[in-house]
């Protein structure tokens, strides 16, 4: 890609989506010896989706909370991401994604400067962005939420916290085999 766009800045990012909802994220909790811990929750089946973009080399992240996943919203997420990172004629981003239907459809609108690279089917272990969810779920773990908007608010707060944790994110997502800048 650097040869094809000589003189342009090139960055390598990864993107994935996670579904969160009123069905709770349960985590272990501390309890006194001999006492059974109790994690209260309310079960529900409304969902929201967190789109996570990560640059493993630096630990930079970009987040979007959207109501669903589909080609139209993925195209919108790509546009917003391209604006955020300044992708265009002079800056190109190779974005690693899985082969979800909304990533591969012919209707996907890919902004100038964004280039999609698809992982092999059924290989989430190769996706650095997949490792983000353990961090984002901390904001909603063991929480009791009445409405999906409460989860979105908690997610938003957690994502803002993570913006300053680039070292932690880099350590979690920058696989030893992930290409590095020369």
Which residue stretches match the model-derived regions?
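RNase H-like polynucleotidyl transferase catalytic core
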Residues: 35-43, 112-131
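Short catalytic/ligand-binding loop motif for oxyanion handling, primarily in non-cytosolic enzymes
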Residues: 21-23, 103-105, 126-128
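Short glycine-/polar-rich loops that comprise or flank the Walker A/P-loop
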Residues: 10, 91, 112-115
